[in-house]
Amino acid sequence: MGFHAYSSPYDWSRIAGFKAAAKAVPGGMINLSVGSPVDSVPDAVQQALASTADASNAHGYPVTAGTVDMKSAIDSWFRNMRGVDLKAVNAAVIPTVGSKEAVALMASLLHLGEGDVVVQPKVSYPTYEIGTQLAGATVAKVDDVTDVDSWVNIPNVKAIWIN
């Protein structure tokens, strides 16, 4: 699976002005951005991390292919907790490092590419567009994806992102 170039900016400079204005308001700004945890790490977790920090395999990102046992456990959880039999609907369990990776790879995992169109809301998560472009597909932005008439006549729509 190769990737195509993408042209959409993904930088925080687009929101810098809004951030500055919010900080000027009494009480400041509430930061709800991606990757900004606010809760402290529990002591037990800190101790477990510290005790394994020097292990030979403790550096770098983990392999995300997942073990057979892990995929089986996920499959069982969906069946037991949600009543969904993933095998019956021919679904695959694809572990990722995080949801952003899953979103960025989704168009490629769906085998979308040149000539395919992905519909998304005009105001949406930037990674929708970046992932679509990486797959080589085209983005079609609409005001409201639930307004099917706004995109139903766009040729070659293969996927729709819904916020």
Residue ranges and their predicted role:
Residues A58-N163:
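Conserved core of the PLP fold type I
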Residues G2-G98:
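N-terminal small-domain helix-loop-helix segment of the aminotransferase-like
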